[in-house]
Amino acid sequence: ERYREFLSRLHDPIIEKLKKGAKGLDYGCGPGPALALMFKEENFSMDIYDPFFFPDKSCFSEQYDFITCTEVAEHFFQPLKEFKKIDQILVKGGWFGLMTSIYDDSICFEDWYYRKDPTHVVFYSFETIKALAALMSWSYERRENNVVLFQK
């Protein structure tokens, strides 16, 4: 229940943007695709992809109305390559929901809990988010709780 509450930080704002029957992908869903289940419970079609737990690459030949990426982007060894993959399978006008801890100057990087996880190999600031949006020609909305919604 607490995990679903955590995931609702991305689920709730993106679901407001979706049309009935929208098709989604949980990109980097991990071993238990709880977010995909939350969307399915609300009658959205959901596919899942995770390079370790659900490595079926057939999603890369599909097109999606929305894509979620929750606590995943900090694990990208080649972030631009991953974001380009996402862009290729997101329909024009589609939504990409990103949740990751966003670094800012109020955080002492050396003490930051997020950087202490050895699997976190890249970090994002709001400047990074703006640059990513510009590079990909996406618009964006920064939401609370480390959530950003991009629209293609």
Q: Where are these predicted regions, by residue range?
A:
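Conserved N-terminal segment of class I S-adenosyl-L-methionine
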Residues: 1-66, 81-84, 99, 116-117, ...
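A short SAM/SAH-binding and catalytic strip from SAM-dependent methyltransferases
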Residues: 66-79
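Short secondary-structure junctions
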Residues: 137-141
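Short glycine/proline- and charge-enriched loop/turn segments
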Residues: 109-117
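Helix-to-beta-strand junctions that scaffold the AdoMet/dcAdoMet cofactor pocket
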Residues: 76-77, 90-92
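Short "lid" loop at the C-terminus of a central beta-strand within the Rossmann-like core
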Residues: 53, 101-106, 122
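Conserved beta-strand signature within the Rossmann-like core of class I S-adenosyl-L-methionine
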Residues: 93-102
